[in-house]
Amino acid sequence: MDEMKDKIRNCCLEKEAAPCVSSCPFHLDIREFIPRLERKAFNLAYRLYANSVAFPRIVAEICDESCKKVCPRKEIGGAINLSMLEKAAVTYADRTDPSSFNLRPKGKKVAVIGAGISSLACALRLANKKYDVTVYEKEDKIGGH
């Protein structure tokens, strides 16, 4: 038991990269996310989450919790239910408008091929950085397969 606690302390709290962060497709900084929620700083938690995932409400609902599979806590009482924490950040934050920055337009055009969620997230990130983005989709609707 002490060996497991040391492993959790080292890889989740202190020294090593947390396995949950590397298993998350968005690399959400869980070490920062959870303490913000513990302090009930939902707006700060939401901002961190939104900066990682681009579409926070959608991702909070469809998250497959890949982090649970690698969480060392699963062996001593259960993995952290990050999906519920994501939903809490989305639900209880009262400032969810995108941040606005006064950046000058880049003057460059970018084409994004496909309108699945990953392509739309890419287009959103580029547009936020003031690129002129055009999304091309061969189907009549967006959202991917």
Regions found by a protein language model. Give the residues of each.
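N-terminal Rossmann-like FAD-binding beta1-loop-alpha1 element of flavoenzymes
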Residues: 108-135
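Residue-level detector of alpha-helix initiation sites
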Residues: 54, 116-117, 141
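Glycine-rich FAD pyrophosphate-binding loop
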Residues: 131-145
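Ferredoxin-type iron-sulfur electron-transfer modules and their immediate structural context
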Residues: 1-109
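Generic detector of intrinsically disordered, low-complexity, polar/charged segments
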Residues: 104, 111-113, 140-141
